[in-house]
UniProtKB/Swiss-Prot annotation:
It comes from Thermosipho africanus (strain TCF52B). This is Large ribosomal subunit protein uL10. GO terms for cellular component: large ribosomal subunit. The keyword RNA-binding applies. Keywords: Ribonucleoprotein, Ribosomal protein, RNA-binding, rRNA-binding. The keyword Phosphoprotein does not apply. HAMAP family: Ribosomal_uL10 (MF_00362). Part of the ribosomal stalk of the 50S ribosomal subunit. The N-terminus interacts with L11 and the large rRNA to form the base of the stalk. The C-terminus forms an elongated spine to which L12 dimers bind in a sequential fashion forming a multimeric L10(L12)X complex. Gene3D superfamilies: 3.30.70.1730, 6.10.250.290. Forms part of the ribosomal stalk, playing a central role in the interaction of the ribosome with GTP-bound translation factors.
Length: 180
């Protein structure tokens, strides 16, 4: 059992973590054993190294830490009923973390169940977790942008090189005609 001072320190530490997190996902871990939670954490580490954490946190501690971090906890009070585990991402792609926990939940037949999440400070309901898990990762989005920009540039290069080739052919034809 934690003393009041320890709880206050924990709230302070968690509020700092939540301030720096791009993703805070709330889930009900009921039905998962320690080995399964460890497996989920391992999968998160494989994708995001130490940038993501999945922790079982007491409801009152999570509530106070989020409130201290500046989140509007009154709008999400139903999140703080029942068992609570929080996935937060301080460093790395939050969409990748959502994909990992969503795939794990599908694999475990809906466990852990989702209660909602904050993504870059905006709250999304539990129903939207599936849609967010289908979004491309930051790396994929950057690749799409690069290929989108690269296409017209390649076209311009091809047009210019084609024009230069045609000019070269014309000059060669003139040279051949004059040499005859």
């Amino acid at each position: 059992m934690l003393t009041r001072a320890q709880k206050e320190q924990l709230v302070k530490e968690l509020s700092e973590v939540f301030k720096n997190s791009s993703l805070i996902l709330f889930s009900d871990y009921k039905g998962l054993n320690v080995a399964q939670i460890t497996d989920l954490r391992k999968k998160l580490r494989e994708k995001l190294a130490d940038g993501a954490r999945y922790k079982v946190i007491k409801n009152s501690v999570a509530y106070l830490a989020l409130k201290e971090a500046g989140y509007n906890v009154e709008e999400i009070e139903d999140v703080f009923s029942g068992p609570l585990a929080i996935l937060y991402v301080e460093d790395g792609d939050p969409i990748e973390a959502i994909k990992v926990i969503y795939d794990f939940s599908k694999e475990m037949k809906g466990i852990p169940s989702f209660k909602g999440l904050y993504l870059d400070g905006k709250f999304f309901s539990a129903d939207e977790v599936e849609n967010l898990s289908k979004l491309p990762s930051k790396e994929q989005l950057l690749a799409m942008v690069v290929s989108g920009v690269q296409g017209p540039i390649r076209g311009l290069v091809n047009v210019l090189s084609g024009t230069l080739k045609n000019l070269l052919y014309a000059l060669n034809a003139i040279k051949d005609k004059k040499s005859e």
